[in-house]
Amino acid sequence: MAVPKRKKSKSRRNMHRSHCKLKVPNIGIDKTTGEYKLSHHICLGGYYNGKQIVEVDSNI
């Protein structure tokens, strides 16, 4: 069984885990509705980049 020769220091341990972190979502404000939305996603009103892409039923 493989066993490490020397103890990994706290610094090297943390550097090894540097990619294991949470990313902050890229949130912006929609131009048409003024609501928050994820970048490069359609807002709940069906708008993308100021243009209506999808017809949204208002009964929902």
UniProtKB/Swiss-Prot annotation:
Single GO cellular component term: large ribosomal subunit
Example of a GO biological process term: translation
InterPro entries: Ribosomal_bL32, Ribosomal_bL32_bact, Ribosomal_zn-bd
Gene3D superfamilies listed in its UniProt record: Single helix bin
Record's keyword terms, sorted: Ribonucleoprotein, Ribosomal protein
Keyword Ribosomal protein annotated: yes
Top-level taxon of the source organism: Bacteria
Molecular function (Gene Ontology), one example: structural constituent of ribosome
Family from the record: Belongs to the bacterial ribosomal protein bL32 family.
Name of protein: Large ribosomal subunit protein bL32
